[in-house]
From Swiss-Prot:
Keyword Metal-binding: yes
Designated name of the protein: Probable inorganic carbon transporter subunit DabA
Domain of life the protein comes from: Bacteria
InterPro entries in the cross-refs: DabA
Any one Gene Ontology cellular component term annotated for this protein: plasma membrane
Role of this protein: Part of an energy-coupled inorganic carbon pump.
MF terms in GO: zinc ion binding
Essential cofactor(s): Zn(2+)
Localization (cell): Cell inner membrane
Amino acid sequence: MSAHHAEQAESPLDNREKLTTAVDKLELVLPCAAPLYDFMHLNTMQGYHHISFAEAMAAHFELTGIRGYLPEEDFRKHYARGRIDDADLNESLANNTHGRNREIVLKVSGRPINKQDIWRISLIQDINPLSPSRFRWQIKEYDALERFQNGVPKSARDTLLNATQETDQNRRTESQAIRDLWEACLRVFQLENPNLHSEELGELVDLEEFSRSQAEGKQSKFRTSQPTLIPQEEMLAEARKDLHHLVDKVGEELSLRGLLQALTGEDLLDQVRPILIRFCASHLDEGFTAWSLPERGQGLYAAWRKCPFAELGLDLARLPDWQSFHAELPEHSVDAVIACLERLKIPESRWEGYLKRIAVELPGWSGLINWRHHRPKYKPNRKAPTSLMDYLAIRLFLDVIHIEQVTQNTWGIAGNLEELKTYFENYLWEFSGRYALFSNTLPEYLAIRAQELIALPRTAQKDRENWRTVSNMIHNWKHNPSAERTKRQTVHSHVWRLFCLAQHLGLPGNEVGKLSSSEAEQLLAILDELTTSERGYIWLCAYEYHYREDYFAALTQNHGRGRWANRNERPEAQLIFCFDDREEGIRRHLEEVNPNLETLGAPGFFGVPIQWRGLDYPDTTPHCPVVVTPVNELHEEPRPEAKKRYGLHKRLYNFKQFLLRVLHNKTRRDLLTSKVLIDVLFPGMLAVLAGKVFFPFQQASLKRKATAALVPPVPTQLKLTVPDDGTEATPDNLRVGFTDAEQAERLAAFLRAIGFTSGFAPLVVLSGHGSMSENNPQLASYDCGASGGRHGGPNARAFAAMANRPEIRARLAEQGIHIPDDTWFIGTEHDTCSESFPWFDLDKVPANFAPALKKLKAEVDQALLLSAHERCRRMASAPRKPSLQQARRHVAERGTDFSQARPELGHATVASALIGRRSVTRGIFLDRRCFVLSYDPTIDDAEGTILEGVLKNAGPVGVGINLDYYFSAANNQGFGSGSKVAQNVTGLFGVMQGIDDDLRTWCSYQMVDVHEPMRVLTVVEATTETLTAIYKRQPSSQEPAGGSWLLPPLRQLIDGGWLLLAAIHPKTGKISVFDPKQGFIPWKSYREPSPLPVVERSMDWYDGYSDPRPPALVEPKQTETHHAA
């Protein structure tokens, strides 16, 4: 065989490998879109961790057109509200413009004006060119030539007024100062004052909008005898250049769908999307539909090849030759992708880019399918396996047949890139006209003319003379001087902008008049010097700096105040909560209720990863971080004395589940059964519905009581301990229960990580958390992230049971952790929605703990009331100034109301994290905005071994939560899931807006509408030397692959600015901020130092306010014993 033939024989295999590699890389740009039941907060931009935050925003915007910052209008509102001030903007400009901010632009009366002065004004004020009509509106409606602009600082106003007075002692008026300035601006650009009546201004607009020849052409209905202003050869050369530029974009910036949209105005995705979504939803369904696709078990692409399209309601009959093409599809999806790309005549060098382009056109569906592809053990994959290659093959197939239809109907040519290029090279006039029309840049009269021509039959469209005439008119309009008005100096653009800028700079008319035209142009050019991405990043940093200054000031002023820097005194009780920001409030309230309590923060699975099966659960579910794979299974079982009772419970429970299945499924799927059931059950269901609508809290309470009466609860225990048989537990060989060695190992590691190895109180409470609400498809997003989007109660219960075993305490003592005999551990769970707090296994608590437990439960109940009260201030529908009981009732009602789109606010407003002893933050009101994770630097080694583990595991978890909320709040349409009100649950695995939308991932609008999007600022109680050593030990770079990006490398997060790091010295309380290029830099506030307010209770600081509150120091009535850190 010749070398040429050998190369040809090998090329299909080479192409397969290239495509497989290319598809694997797509996870870098696709969201990690887990199904609803496994929803997990992750960084929406996780594929960009290897570059900086700012670079990632720019790259993602270039790829998708989705902006990653708040709109500037929103930032300006925050500025107006005082959430950002001038000092913050100055600091941000100084830190993020690489020294350009200090460049002197000009000096006026000895006063230097630098770029920072101009940039700050351009950020705060909207100083953009106006259209003539908007300019007229400003003059007429706002008296813009008589009054100062809104937002002009008092110092600038005084400067302009004083300059006017110096010129004429009798004319120190605002109106005269503004007129002098306006006339000076006109003189700089040598333009006349348009002092016209409004009707005359309207005529001026028309004259600037169209040239005289175009106006005449319009009035004469576009006479074809219009003179040619540009040689034909030049016009064709320009059109040919545009054509080649557009065709060259296909594969990187455009798909063929985008190319056709640029030439026809039609979006093929509107036709492709409903078919693609209906099929994919049917295949991926997790229990919603009554009928499943045949061949579903063979995979997504295999099911597509054998799909009964008519039965599924997929209308393809109108498309040309789809059946023959479908019959020719190869067996493997990768071969189908190759066949489609070759049929579309996409050059091989652009295949990777082309696949990326079509994948990000529907990122939600692509992301979910990619998620399932990387998790073959995911239970629904057993019935319906899938892969991203399968999805792309189907998408390309649909693109091919729809593109063929458009090109055949429009131009009578084959639907591929080469045919389109060849056709328009022969019909450059038509290309020029179409391209200009669908770029949406033409004036109305030209757009109408081109649209009329497109509406003609195809044979008439090909008339070169018709298209030449229209293209000639378009070229005349483009190259007429009046059409290039943005490059010319005009009153409503250049003069207006200089006029506004001078007011804010405090430049009076006599100083502006000294400027040359080029100097004025330079000033205006600086206004536009910052790119959109740079402006967004500068605003974001200013927003973050404002919060940072308050936060750092609070930590600094609190140094030495907080209790429990050491445990020389024994606390009355210790409560370990998840480090979740929502638990910061209840911890603070507990310490205010009883200052002798100590609270700690820890990952909410408490170091006990399990596959959990509750008493009535048919299957196990993982309760641990998503990056951890449990090797132990834990079952809840009835206690020996309740086994007989459990038999009845099980029968009644199964019967109840059977009735629910009949009610939910038969009424939707079976014609006869549904008719009977609806007639029989209608009166009762009407009463239930009325209760849910008008009395949700009472209805839910009645439902719980009825369920308890019909299916009596059973006392349970954990099947916790098993003997060590020498077999290693693995993810594929789960151990049911834990050996003594495993229990001691997990407890010791956990207690050391949170710095809790001594000073145990008589009662130690571990509180997991979760959230219960009605009609909430994203319920898992409110649960414990450290427990994998599940409740943390089972983990807390398991830890407490382990820690109470004498055998385990003996093993811990061998490792230097001595738990006294008079200490008892109790597991609980905090419902962050209803503020309920069930306690586990209280009947096992020894009687001698009863008085202390009774007192502690009363204090916890009081703290829950206070927590509910604090939460109510951020909820628009909550009563204003509620009593504690009213607040508790309100938050409980929200969880039972199936119409409530905001049962709780989740992680909204989270902005910071603190890793250290409780003494660092105790006594500070942090407004439920801070992850508070316990760590004791005094028990760690010199290398920071414990701290390194904490940072590597907790850091990415906090970043994932924070950035999910950040992006969903900054651009909910681009990154979030839209409003819950319009969401439709699809296949029980996702939500869409409407019926044929992209699958919407991440947070809904109602979850983030009060969120202040900023990156998490993580302060670690450690020396800078220790943190620097840990930082240097981390891998400097790591490309995400195969799903490893779920736990991104710590150094990538820090280097890229995804996580903002600072250190607080354990002894001095001095704060240093980390910069990847310079290391740790001592923090020095750019504000004037001022003492924080001191209040007796948190309520004294937040009550009556609905916006975020800055930190304050809390000093309860009872005097605490202070221990220096």
